[in-house]
Design a protein with these regions (language model features):
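Juxtamembrane extracytoplasmic/periplasmic/luminal helical "stalk" adjacent to the first N-terminal
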Residues: 1-120, 310-434, 452
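Short, positively charged
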Residues: 78-86, 120-131, 177-183, 213-222, ...
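Solvent-exposed, extracytoplasmic
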Residues: 126-140, 213-267, 304-330, 436-452, ...
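Extracytoplasmic/periplasmic ligand-binding sensor regions of membrane-associated signaling proteins
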Residues: 130-131, 135-225, 270-281, 432, ...
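Sensor-regulatory modules in signal-transduction proteins
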Residues: 204-206, 285-290
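PAS (Per-ARNT-Sim) sensory domains
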Residues: 213, 297-298
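Long, ordered, amphipathic alpha-helical scaffolds
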Residues: 258-261, 276-285, 299
Length: 489
């Protein structure tokens, strides 16, 4: 715990409490009431008023600290909630995107045109292959280069003009030793001009022997920018950091340049950048079908003044319903406030009974002031409690809204990838043979790589299914769905 202006806050909250207007407003108002209670307690003692205010004052102090700490924690949670979702979605969208690339490399490394070009290295065939790769890249727009190399590291052909000699990149040796598996690297690569490149590579095989290496260079800058633009709001910073806590990319190179080391703990809620305190949330990638990506995490940051600027404001009252929505701690705050008020009412009532036989105008005035201060205290606690619950409700609403919007975006991106798949596969030479065995084997291999599909079918011009990747029971069946005619039109 750390103390800020006489109030104890949890260590994660204390550095940010000064930036929370709602917390500061209630703290000042409650501090003024506390001073009033101290004065009234002293006057009650000096006037011999039979009213012991020590218990009420102690309860008031305890609940003040509890209320302000709770309000600060929920205000921070309201700010960090969306940031945490932004960071989680950013790294998960990137991870899912890269998972699709592992399927691409598995498919392309066995492409007949690529295998053939590795074997004979005929210039005309390599030129034709380059156009083949350009067609692929035009459909799958996530690559900035595709490079085919011989086992000796020589660049045979590539998507864009560039390094054309013999590469000494470590990715080649790793891919050649991969025995049919892909490798993923993020390192400076000579065939990418010695710049950092996120590459998926796999060896190209012919009759069980290595004929070359295919490398897909992911357009990280473009794809990360698309993610950042979709998720980051004004003046927010989104960044990917590696396993060593160094920034890979961010949407604000001035505040978080590539290569900068993040020294804050992974669970830290605050981070200072350029002399400005930021609220921060960090999220690691969640595995997708066992794939966790290159081991990166995402950071989302917002200046504290911006993050806490809106708050719940004048939000309407929140009903105390739904135990699964509000924590017991939150629900206890107004209950404890009402209990303090009941004790205060009893104390004032007893004091009035005691003074009924006396004519002390001062004592009667003092009791009236105690009662009025009690009402102001009750009002302040109710307002703070209402704002506290409205803060939580606003956070839940914002969370639901953000997740709903991004769920639609993720689904749309997934379907976009599926449209790319079908356009590319429709031109595959193995499928064009219409040989049931060849087509079935090809579809099964594709479905093993692109696991999002429940089944893959090839049907002839009459709509009769020739082969299926998984459900052989549909083979020979004639499809009568309206989309069949649309595909054949």
């Amino acid at each position: 715990m750390a103390t800020y202006k006489g109030i104890s806050f949890p260590d994660t909250v204390a550095p940010l409490a000064r930036h929370m207007p709602a917390v500061d407003d209630h703290r000042e108002a409650l501090a003024a009431l506390s001073a009033t209670w101290d004065t009234l307690g002293l006057l009650a003692h000096l006037s011999n008023l039979k009213a012991d205010m020590r218990e009420v004052r102690a309860s008031f102090g305890e609940l003040t600290g509890e209320l302000l700490a709770c309000l600060a924690e929920e205000t921070l949670a309201l700010a960090r909630g969306p940031l945490g979702h932004q960071a989680q979605i950013a790294v998960d969208v990137l991870t899912r995107n890269l998972f699709e690339r592992t399927a691409d490399i598995g498919f392309l490394a066995t492409d007949a045109a690529i295998v053939g070009a590795c074997l004979d290295r005929d210039p005309a065939r390599l030129a034709a292959l380059r156009e083949h790769l350009r067609t692929f890249a035009a459909r799958y727009t996530v690559y900035r280069d595709i490079v085919l190399l011989g086992p000796d590291g020589r660049v045979l052909t590539r998507l864009v003009d560039g390094f054309a000699g013999w590469s000494s990149s470590s990715v080649i040796g790793r891919a050649l030793g991969g025995q049919g598996g892909w490798v993923e690297t993020y390192e400076a690569t000579d065939f990418c001009g010695d710049a950092l490149a996120l590459t998926h590579a796999r060896r190209v095989e012919h009759e069980g022997r290595a004929a070359g290496v295919l490398a897909l260079v992911f357009d990280l800058e473009r794809e990360a920018t698309l993610i950042f633009e979709r998720l980051a709001r004004e003046d927010e910073v989104l960044a990917f950091v590696d396993a060593d806590d160094r920034v890979v990319l961010s949407n604000d190179a001035a505040r978080l340049p590539p290569g900068r080391r993040i020294t804050a703990r992974p669970d830290a809620a605050a981070l200072r950048l350029g002399g400005v305190t930021h609220v921060v949330a960090r999220r690691a990638a969640q595995a997708y079908q066992g794939y966790t990506g290159p081991g990166w995490a995402a950071l989302a940051l917002a200046p504290a003044e911006l993050a806490f600027g809106d708050g719940a404001g004048d939000a309407g009252p929140v009903a105390f319903t739904g135990e699964n929505v509000f924590s017991q701690r939150l629900r206890d705050v107004p209950v404890r406030a009402r209990e303090i008020q009941r004790r205060l009412d009893r104390m004032v009532w007893n004091g009035r009974l005691h003074q009924a036989s006396e004519s002390s105008a001062f004592s009667r005035s003092l009791l009236e002031e105690i009662a009025a201060t009690g009402r102001r205290t009750k009002d302040r606690f109710e307002r703070a409690s209402s704002q506290l619950l409205a803060t939580v409700a606003a956070g839940l609403q914002a969370e639901a809204r953000l997740l709903a919007e991004l769920s639609v975006d993720i689904l749309a991106r997934c379907l976009y990838e599926r449209a790319n798949d079908i356009r590319w596969w429709a031109a595959d030479a193995a499928l064009a043979t219409l040989d049931a065995g060849t087509v079935r084997a090809t579809l099964a291999r594709l479905n093993g790589l692109y696991t999002v599909y429940a089944n893959l079918l090839v049907f002839d011009t009459q709509g009769r299914v020739l082969a299926a990747s998984r459900d052989a029971g549909v083979e020979g069946r004639t499809l009568a769905n309206p989309w069949v005619a649309e595909c054949l039109a």
